[in-house]
């Protein structure tokens, strides 16, 4: 069993799903994984964070990821490998500049009889070109250029 929840948002105001996803993510992350009474339970936790700054645009990008995997022994009837693996991950990316703020977050939960390869975590380097500022102000054209007659270019 695995489940992934994604939420892309530009500002959280007016987004009815923003609060629900945040609550679900907090519940999922705080949820005890594994079999609390198992003596041979193994747990692995990973926390990663990266930041980029774009001084020319006065912009910042941040990515944080928390992942926890727990495994424990189980009868062969339940799992052919003899272990059960549960993984929970929460990933959050933010991009902000003076005129805009974008947030994206994803939560992931899986339970399996064998360790699953980790789902790809979006890299900040691949995400920021999408959000990076590109000047979009309308071009201003002086009226003297509009009145000038077009020049004819002769090619020999």
From Swiss-Prot:
Belongs to the polerovirus movement protein family. The keyword Ribosomal protein does not apply. Residues 57-156 are annotated as: RNA-binding. This is Movement protein P17. It comes from Potato leafroll virus (strain Potato/Netherlands/Wageningen/1989) (PLrV). Expressed as a nonphosphorylated 20kDa form and a phosphorylated 22kDa form. Phosphorylated by a host PKC-related kinase. Serine phosphorylation is required for plamodesma targeting. Pfam families: Luteo_Vpg (PF01659). InterPro entries: Luteo_VPG.
């Amino acid at each position: 069993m695995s489940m992934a929840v994604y939420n892309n948002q530009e500002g959280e105001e007016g987004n009815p799903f923003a609060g629900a996803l945040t609550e679900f993510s907090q519940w999922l992350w705080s949820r005890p994984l594994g079999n609390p009474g198992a003596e041979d339970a193994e747990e692995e936790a990973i926390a990663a964070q990266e930041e980029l700054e774009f001084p020319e645009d006065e912009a910042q990008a941040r990515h944080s990821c928390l992942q926890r995997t727990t495994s424990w022994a189980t009868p062969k009837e339940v799992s052919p490998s003899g272990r059960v693996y549960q993984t929970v991950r929460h990933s959050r990316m933010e991009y902000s500049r003076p005129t805009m703020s974008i947030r994206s977050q994803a939560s992931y939960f899986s339970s399996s009889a064998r360790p699953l390869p980790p789902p790809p975590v979006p890299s900040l380097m691949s995400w920021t070109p999408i959000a990076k500022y590109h000047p979009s102000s309308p071009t201003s054209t002086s009226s003297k250029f509009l009145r000038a007659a077009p020049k004819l270019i002769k090619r020999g």
